[in-house]
Amino acid sequence: MGRYFGTSGIREVVNEKLTPELALKVGLALGTYLQEGKVVIGCDTRTSSVMLKNAVISGLLATGIDVIDIGLAPTPLTGFAIRLYNAEAGVTITASHNPPQYNGIKVWDRDGMAYTPDKEHELEKIIESGNFRRVPWNEVGTLKTANPRKEYIEAILREINLKGSYTVVIDAGNGAGSIVSPYLHRELGNRVITLNSDPSGFFVRELEPNKESLSMLEKTVKVLNADIGIAHDGDADRVGVVDENGEFVEYEVMLSLIAGYMLKKYGKGKIVTTVDAGFALDDYIRELGGEVVRTRVGDVAVAEELVKHGGVFGGEPSGTWIMPQWNLTPDGIFASALVLEMIDRLGPIGELAKDVPKYVTLRKKIPCSNELKNKVMNKIADLIPREFSYERIITIDGIRIENDDWWILFRPSGTEPIMRITLEAHTEEMAERLMKKAENLVKSVIKDLSS
């Protein structure tokens, strides 16, 4: 990670590390890097988003870059608008699933793919140098506003076709998805009920769509006898799913199901995922004649591998999916329509999920300052051979150790001051035992290095 950019752009607490001054510099740096052309910019519903968006716009205009402001917009809408308006780049002001005190700045290229670490490093060098391009008064960029929502929905309707009509409950999490996702599903012919659909920066539930945060969605699906529940995070680059029985479908299961459906829809090929994805995906995809390729965590890494291998689908076990036939931007809204198409063609998710191999997955977050992360990882690397007996090790992002019946991933978060432990095992007893051992190791290392 660089000084400013992590695994998902810049993401920090507002008015502490992420200030309007920094946002202005990002705009100046991006304009200096591009030299010419148009940039699309949109933001999520956070209370600080308009403030930061306007600062980035000012920096871009000062360098002679024309800006198209699409206002409140889910991240996938920004990715779509880049191509719609033939822009050189796009910017989203969002902290995705982080708590409301956070915000972020994420930059996208003309193909809708997030800026790579190399490109972000170039922006950081320009910020550090302070050598910004500043044009004279008669060359300042122009600012236009636009609303591409209609075109976005129409484009999805050309890709997704439902034969039936379904009852869909959508929990938009008070995020930017609330202004698009319910409308799309009504246009698809579904009966739509919404939860947390007020686009407010004071979020009612935890933004990360998971079983703990979606209890109300589960209850609503069950009470209304709905066909499916759909949930988004703050910028709708993710999708979470509740099945027809009112049960949250674990991300590992949904990743396997949708990857398998993409193979059936578009033909055999490579499925790209990240180092924190489990064995179930490999087992499920192998049966369908596909191949799984792993890369580091983050949608940009997934997108890069999709382009490199000509992959059919890319996804993370966090509900972040990229459909390259559609766009290289992670798109939780298009993904939700794709899930409905899968149900329409293959049957209820609860039934489909029975075909996905079941393993026990555990995740743990342990507080760790950003300054300590590298030292902690180095120490863990030294201690792992003494603490665990394993057959394989993968170090493309963090440290993943594997045996045939379990794996553990130690990885510093690129967006929060935490260490992440993710593991999978064939039995619950084994998973609990491994997690206790892994957690004790990380906590003891952090304690030793903090004293």
Curated annotation (Swiss-Prot):
A Gene Ontology BP annotation from the UniProt entry: carbohydrate metabolic process
Residues that hold Mg(2+) according to the record: 96, 233, 235, 237
Organism: Pyrococcus horikoshii (strain ATCC 700860 / DSM 12428 / JCM 9974 / NBRC 100139 / OT-3)
Sorted UniProt keywords: Isomerase, Magnesium, Metal-binding, Phosphoprotein
Family: Belongs to the phosphohexose mutase family.
Name of the protein described by the UniProt record: Probable phosphoglucosamine mutase
Cofactor notes: Binds 1 Mg(2+) ion per subunit.
Domain of life of the organism encoding this protein: Archaea
A GO term, aspect molecular function: magnesium ion binding
PTM description: Activated by phosphorylation.
Cofactor: Mg(2+)
